[in-house]
């Protein structure tokens, strides 16, 4: 109720700028960053729990572990990363390509001109809705042959490999940001979707 009352009060105070240009400062900014830290920490622990479950269930041995996140606020350096990941000098990071082709295992170069960042993936060739209209589940299944997955279906069609740019598109454009150490090919792929 308290949150709803504050929101109602804030709606009554119409800002003099369009919503997309609105910002917070002072105490509201500090509260926002505080809450963002909590949400990002919760997400980190959630990812760790999922990884622990998969590692245990598959009987894997972890040789190296690190986290790469995108679309977040780097609160230590006050960098908003939308469509990018941290690529500080010497930092290990992962850049996903698609469900079929895997990910690039990289080391950051700490390029200040790139805001100490790298792209968070290959990028889409088309919107999610366009992908669902352009491709079929049978095409999707064929593309995923050789990779164990229970995630190929109509609800995940927007994530099919054909909806994304190819590996060469990103490899040829990220040299200023990272060194590519290896290409990791998936053996198991899971993507949550709507139940069918």
Regions found by a protein language model. Give the residues of each.
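Domain-length cofactor-binding catalytic modules of enzymes
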Residues: 1-196
């Amino acid at each position: 109720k308290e949150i709803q009352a504050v929101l109602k009060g804030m709606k009554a105070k119409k800002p003099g700028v369009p919503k997309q240009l609105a910002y917070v400062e002072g105490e509201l900014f500090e509260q926002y960053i505080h809450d963002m830290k909590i949400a990002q920490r919760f997400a980190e622990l959630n990812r760790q729990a999922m990884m622990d479950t998969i590692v245990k269930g598959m009987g894997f041995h972890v040789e190296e572990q690190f986290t790469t996140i995108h679309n977040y606020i780097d609160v230590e350096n006050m960098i908003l990363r939308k469509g990018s990941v941290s690529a500080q000098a010497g930092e290990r990071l992962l850049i996903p390509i698609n469900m079929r082709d895997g990910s690039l295992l990289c080391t950051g170069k700490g390029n200040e001109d790139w805001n100490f960042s790298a792209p968070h993936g290959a990028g889409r060739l088309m919107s999610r809705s366009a992908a669902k209209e352009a491709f079929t589940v049978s095409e999707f299944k064929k593309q995923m042959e050789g990779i164990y997955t229970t995630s190929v279906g109509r609800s995940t069609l927007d994530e099919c490999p054909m909806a994304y740019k190819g590996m060469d598109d990103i490899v040829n454009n990220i040299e200023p940001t990272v060194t590519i150490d290896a290409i990791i090919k998936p053996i198991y792929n899971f993507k949550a979707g709507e139940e069918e």
